[in-house]
Amino acid sequence: MKTACIQMDMLFAQPEENFAKAKRLIREAMAGGPDVVVLPETWNTGFFPKERLSELAEQDCARVKRELGGLAAELGVNLVAGSVANVRGGKVYNTACVFDRAGNCVAEYDKTHLFTPMGEHAYFTPGDHLCRFRLDGHDCGLVICYDIR
């Protein structure tokens, strides 16, 4: 599986600009013919606007699913939409969504091991399950940053 990992200069607390930049970079990455494109952690807000987190957070990843799921389908590429601050059930999670080539959201994962030295535990709710999914017939898993430890 050929993977394109996108590193982007995120604009702090500016999701509109970051969405536009992410979509542009995903399109540019397609020149390399990837099977999957991966965005970084907290790509839509930067890491992370503590005082405005709830205000800037996605609601059930609705915009990510609509815009990036649509882009995955348009480009015919699997897409790991990094992670975004996401409000679900009144709590804020650090959530990643995974889209297949048809734009279907095949997995959602909430970061389980929050990075205490950066204060994540004071703003995010930890996830409570592992993530496993299939892309192009391959079994895949997903971790976010500190989860790898």
Positions of PLM-derived features:
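Short polar catalytic/cofactor-binding loops
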Residues: 7-13
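Conserved protein kinase catalytic core
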Residues: 13, 47, 114-117
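Active-site catalytic loop in hydrolytic enzyme cores
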Residues: 60, 87-149
